[in-house]
From Swiss-Prot:
CDD domains: AAK_NAGK-C (cd04250)
Pathway(s) per entry: Amino-acid biosynthesis; L-arginine biosynthesis; N(2)-acetyl-L-ornithine from L-glutamate: step 2/4
Family listed: Belongs to the acetylglutamate kinase family. ArgB subfamily.
Upper lineage: Bacteria, Pseudomonadati, Pseudomonadota, Alphaproteobacteria, Hyphomicrobiales
Swiss-Prot/TrEMBL keywords: Amino-acid biosynthesis, Arginine biosynthesis, ATP-binding, Cytoplasm, Kinase, Nucleotide-binding, Transferase
GO cellular component terms given for this protein: cytoplasm
Protein's recorded name: Acetylglutamate kinase
Function comment: Catalyzes the ATP-dependent phosphorylation of N-acetyl-L-glutamate.
Organism name: Chelativorans sp. (strain BNC1)
GO MF, one annotated term: ATP binding
Cell location: Cytoplasm
Length: 297
């Protein structure tokens, strides 16, 4: 047997092993939050686009939600606007939100659409404004002063929280074989435009469409235990316990809390996985052991 034949047989075996998982997700909706290091790496970006295209070809209905914090910061710097933060969160004034919308719904969104279209699929770029898909209201964030222990309200400007999601447009796109690529910008009933955290936006979308899976592509392998080993699966109650005992800490806390909120909205399972691994989406959905931490009810 030649080396070429052995390689071909190995590839065929991988495809055969993936079949039951493809059947499991056929006609199911998978929401993917695309962000982190993968967005700044050309090779990883192309691998991600190919994963999304393969999902669609396999009968899955993928919906992509993307972030863009670093790109927003770069654009603000180029335009001579200083980035301001309160309690670790970006303050978004009127001028800043216009730039945020330009970067997210314009530049980044269309780059992702182009990558997916280059793989032979039909992707379409949208934001919460399109089809009145998402309405937001001003986010209410509070912090506790460590010295006085007094809670104060942060004014983050035009930072919003999604409060209404209409799935009508997403359902139409699913039936038309198109792949929605969503930027986390949405209008408020007050007429203003709001910048929404991409994780929160993805969770709201996934809950509205009752997604089978919500995938968060991050810069870490998933949730780690105290020995820094990957935890393959957690229930909501187990995740809460790990937050309480400090095993889950720092920036992973809001990520896991968003996962829990999505499950409470009707998502069947949420996965935190490493977007720096090429084809991590396919590894998670179409292999036996997955690629990250799955959180279930």
């Amino acid at each position: 047997m030649t080396e070429i034949t052995e390689t071909a047989e190995a590839q065929a075996a991988l495809l055969s092993a993936a079949l039951p998982y493809m059947q499991r997700y056929e006609n199911k909706t998978v929401v993917i939050k695309y962000g982190g290091h993968a967005m700044g790496d050309i090779a990883l970006g192309r691998a991600f686009a190919r994963d999304v295209a393969l999902l669609k070809q396999s009968g899955v209905n993928p919906i992509v939600v993307h972030g863009g914090g670093p790109q927003i910061g770069d654009m603000l710097k180029r335009m001579g606007i200083e980035s301001k933060f309160e309690g670790g969160l970006r303050v978004t004034d009127q001028k800043t939100v216009e730039i945020v919308e330009m970067v997210l719904a314009g530049s980044i969104n269309k780059e992702i659409v182009a990558l997916i279209n280059a793989e032979g699929e039909w992707a379409i770029g949208l934001c919460g404004k399109d089809g009145n898909m998402v309405f937001a209201e001003k986010a209410r964030k509070t912090v506790v002063d460590p010295d006085s222990n007094i809670e104060r309200v942060l004014d983050l400007g035009f930072v919003g929280e999604p409060v209404e999601v209409d799935r009508t447009l997403l359902d139409l796109l699913a039936r038309s074989e198109m792949i929605p690529v969503l930027a986390p910008v949405a209008p408020g009933r007050d007429g203003y435009t709001y910048n929404i955290n991409a994780d929160t936006f993805a969770g709201a979308i996934a809950g509205a469409v009752k997604a089978s899976r919500l995938l968060f592509l991050t810069d870490v392998p998933g949730v780690l235990d105290r020995d820094k080993k990957l935890i393959n699966e957690l229930t909501v109650s187990q995740a809460r316990a790990l937050i309480k005992d400090g095993t889950i800490s720092g920036g992973m806390i809001p990520k896991v809390e968003t996962c829990i909120e999505a499950i409470q909205r009707g998502v069947e399972g949420v996965v935190i996985l490493n977007g720096k691994t090429a084809h991590s989406v396919l590894l998670e959905l179409f292999t036996e052991h997955g690629a990250g931490t799955l959180i279930v009810p």
